[in-house]
Amino acid sequence: MPVIYINLIAAFFMAFMGLLIYRSHLMSSLLCLEGMMLSLFILNSTLALSMHFTLYSMMPIILLVFAACEAALGLSLLVMVSNTYGLDYVQNLNLLQC
């Protein structure tokens, strides 16, 4: 396995560990999710280039579309929560209240 794949997998798991550690703030969680999606995008792009498989070349673009939708939804949720409650602490929010 080439070194670049090991580095990209390590970057994914570091972002995942950051997501587990910094889950109290919504902004930190969103940044860690973006790091995970970026490492997956680069990994899929390098795999698509090295495999020369035509159908697999669309996979990074589809992943990038999902990452953009996830980022837009996460930022809109962050703006809504910060306007409503004035903070982005996830632990202080109770989603069962109306």
Swiss-Prot record:
EC number(s) per entry: 7.1.1.2
What top-level class of enzyme does the UniProt entry assign?
translocase
Q: Which UniProt keywords apply?
A: Electron transport, Membrane, Mitochondrion, Mitochondrion inner membrane, NAD, Respiratory chain, Translocase, Transmembrane, Transmembrane helix, Transport, Ubiquinone
Grouped into one coarse class, the protein's main location is mitochondrion
What's the catalysed reaction? a ubiquinone + NADH + 5 H(+)(in) = a ubiquinol + NAD(+) + 4 H(+)(out)
Membrane topology reported for the UniProt record: Multi-pass membrane protein
| GO BP term, pick one | ATP synthesis coupled electron transport
* InterPro entries assigned to the protein according to its UniProt record, in alphabetical order: NADH_UbQ_OxRdtase_chain4L/K, NUOK/Mnh_C1-like
Q: Name one Pfam family in it.
A: Oxidored_q2
Cellular localization per UniProt: Mitochondrion inner membrane
Segments passing through the bilayer: 1-21, 29-49, 61-81
UniProt superkingdom: Eukaryota
Q: Name one GO cellular component term.
A: mitochondrial inner membrane
Into which family does the record put it? Belongs to the complex I subunit 4L family.
Quaternary structure annotation from Swiss-Prot or TrEMBL: Core subunit of respiratory chain NADH dehydrogenase (Complex I) which is composed of 45 different subunits.
User: What does the function comment of this entry state?
Assistant: Core subunit of the mitochondrial membrane respiratory chain NADH dehydrogenase (Complex I) which catalyzes electron transfer from NADH through the respiratory chain, using ubiquinone as an electron acceptor. Part of the enzyme membrane arm which is embedded in the lipid bilayer and involved in proton translocation.
Q: What is this protein's record name?
A: NADH-ubiquinone oxidoreductase chain 4L
